[in-house]
Amino acid sequence: MENHKTDDRMEDLMQKVRESRGSDAASMLDYCTQIEEYADRVGDARLLGFAHYYKGRTYYLSNETGKVFEEIGEALGYLEQSGQWELVAASYNLMAIVSVGKGNLSFAIEYYLAGLKYCKKYELIEVESRIESNLGS
């Protein structure tokens, strides 16, 4: 699996995902599915990680927590393979938030710490601040 030069249609879909996240779950999932199908065809880890991460995030905002772990779990390998460290750290933060909501505090701490490890290693100050804020609440 590789990172490929992304065609304009995929770049447009990715931009739509970034711009409309949190506003229209059905459209977000459709955009992500289109990206995922294309990425599967061409073997693009970067796009697969992106699509699964944003699907997971959309499911979180829709309160479908079981699907969050399914999508984020799928995303993590692709995100790491393609070096999308900010999304890796954000994935761990999201899994921690869901774990807190389910009362699994020990898992939440592990996820927060994993996210912080990536933040420190790759100097991801914004994500690090979000994780630290979540840890403090």
Positions of predicted regions on the chain:
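Eukaryotic all-alpha helical interaction scaffolds
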Residues: 39, 59, 79-80, 99, ...
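Conserved alpha-helical positions within TPR/SEL1-like repeat arrays
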Residues: 14-21, 50-61, 86-101, 112, ...
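Short, charge-rich amphipathic alpha-helical segments embedded
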Residues: 37-51
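Residue signature of alpha-solenoid helical repeat architecture, marking inter-repeat boundaries
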Residues: 7-8, 42, 46, 86, ...
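Residue register within tetratricopeptide repeats
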Residues: 26-29, 66, 86, 106
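Tandem repeat domain/solenoid detector
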Residues: 64, 73-83, 104, 113-123
